[in-house]
Structure formats: C-alpha cells, structure tokens
Amino acid sequence: MSNSLGKLFQITSFGESHGDCVGVVIDGVPAGLAINVDEIQIEVDKRKSGAKAHTTPRREDDRIEIFSGIFNNFTTGAPICLVIWNKNIDSSEYERTRSKIRPGHADFTGFMKYGGFNDYRGGGRFSGRITAGHVMAGAIARKLISTIGIEVIGYTAELGGITAKLPKHKDIRQNISQSDVNCPDLAASKQMVALIQQAAEEGDSLGGVVECIGLNLPVGLGEPVFDTLEGELAKAIFAIPAVKGVEFGAGFGASRLRGSKNNDPFNIQSDQIRTTSNNCGGILGGISDGMPLHVRVAVKPTPSISLSQPTVNLDTMTNTSLEIRGRHDTCIVPRAVSVVEAMTCIVLADLALRAGIIPRVIKQ
C-alpha cells in the first residue's frame, strides 16, 4: 500500500473504517506555527456525519487527540500525530454479507490484491472514514498557507444534475453556512436537499460536483515537469474515495473552444500581471500564475444503496444478489467538500515549502 503524500509537507494516513482509530502523521511542518486543537476540530466537524442532509446514521464524536508535534499551541518541528478513535462501530451487516462483493466498492479489487487478508468491515482502508485523517492534516496545512495569504474555499457546485449559480467569491462562505449541502446558491440548495430526500426514500443515491478555489496564490507554485501544480492536486484529490474526475479552469470544455476564446489575455492590474479571463484555472505550464486556482471534482453516487443488485458470492463462486442494509450516506458530495479543501491545502503547503516561499521556522 502507498499511504504517504507529499515531499516536504508529507502526510501518512493510517487506520480503517471499523478499526480502533483513524489518523495521520504529518512530517515537515515548520516550527513556530500557532495552532490549537479547536482549529483542527472545526475542520473535522465539517465532514463528520450528521452535519449535513441525509448523511450516514453512524454518529462519531470525532474528537481529536494530539499525540506529538504540538506544544503550548505551537508546532515544534517534530512529526505531528493526530488520532480520532472509532467508537460507534457496527460490523454485523458486513459479517452477514462478507462473501458478497458490493457493486461500486473496492471489495473485489481489495480482496484480489491482498489475498483476502484486508479488513473488509466498512470498506476498511478504502472507506471514506479514513478522510478524517486527511482533513486533520488539511487543517494544519490551511493554517500554514494562511501565513502567506492563501485562502481555500470549496462548495457543492452540482448535485444530482442540479447546478448552482455562483455568487462572488466574498459571498460564498456566508451562503455555504446557510446551506445543508454546502451550496452557495441557496435556491439550488433547497432543491438539492429535496432531491436527496427523494433518492433516500427510493433506496438510491446521488453524485455531484465539488468546486474548489484558491485565492491569493503567489506566482510560481508547481515543479514541472512531473510535479506540476495540477498534477499534484489531481493525485491528492483522486485519493478521496468516490472521486472519478478532476478538471482545472475550463477543463474538458477547453477542447471545444478555439484558441482565441480559450487563451487568457494578459494585462496590468494594480501593478501586477494578471489575465482578463481564467480558462487556465490559475495554472500555466504546471505553475500557478497568480490568478485564482479553480478545480472541479466529479464525485460518483454513493455505491451503497438498499436496492437489490446483482453480484457474486466469492465463497461459492456463484451469481447472487445483494441488498445493503448498513448505515450509509445517500449523497456524500456535501461531506466531500471539506476533504477536497483539505487535499488542496496539503498540496499547496507542500509546493510552497518546496518553492521556499514558506520558511522552516514561522516567526509570529
């Protein structure tokens, strides 16, 4: 398994969905960064179940424990170890259907790759539960990149085919705080909630699109040719379970434009070189260009549904069917927002350190 990400700001994820805990070790955080457990907890609370409409009935406190690397509310420069204990575990449904591989899940591929020794309960290492560790690391990264003025904002841009109309950047956070699905378009938000409720009643699930923007990025983040800004972001974001696509700026839409329409013309704005449009999504040649970073992330429908689905029994090697009765989200898109934000912050922190923009000791 590959469980680490990053070069200088490096995270190592550990834990399983129904194991004792989930957590993360973060290496390379500069000393002197002011951070306390409450700041990390705020980010973790955004992704936990029960915070948004029709999330899994599995309720976890998700209280963070700091094992190392933070002393007197400052980072010490040592590895930071953060842990959340799993307390509300019910593996009975997974034991009942253990031999039946769940369509849309990693049960089959995990079984084949690890010879059946992998922890299958709740999806084990393949579960969205492990993203609690990603979000904890993202909270540290968010605080670190804030020292150079970078802000990262994610939101639900589309859910079940309902598309949000986006307000100005300054209004997004305020609107999201009033939405049950992290959508800045409050009219679309109500429609999304109703659609989630309908899908839940029908025993089905929904997917959608998360958008993430990064503001105030300096020019120069990204290490061509193999560690480009979009390459590192795509790798990190694809580590989120259920993500099936990532695009930047105009993305695949650029393939349908002429160069005269896709190119972003340069001009001088407040003594800075900027572009009058942003089809490149803030990245040119794999390097940040000073414009807002714009990422779109496709999230597939939750594969755990209560409708009967054809599958295979691994023990008997026969065709069978499966109805999933466990505790699952009808739509994970609203909860995925905080994870996409976290992975974006982690990559930006790593690349800012590699570029020498963030020092090894933070002086207040």
From Swiss-Prot:
Residues where NADP(+) binds: 47
InterPro entries given in the database record: Chorismate_synth, Chorismate_synth_AroC_sf, Chorismate_synthase_CS
Pathway noted in the entry: Metabolic intermediate biosynthesis; chorismate biosynthesis; chorismate from D-erythrose 4-phosphate and phosphoenolpyruvate: step 7/7
GO cellular component, one term: cytosol
Catalytic activity from the UniProt record: 5-O-(1-carboxyvinyl)-3-phosphoshikimate = chorismate + phosphate
Any GO molecular function: FMN binding
Binding site for FMN: 125-127, 285, 300-304, 327
EC class: lyase
Needed co-factor(s): FMNH2
NCBIfam families assigned: aroC (TIGR00033), PRK05382.1 (NF003793)
Role summary: This reaction introduces a second double bond into the aromatic ring system.
Assembly description: Homotetramer.
Protein name as catalogued: Chorismate synthase
Protein source organism: Dehalococcoides mccartyi (strain CBDB1)
Gene: aroC
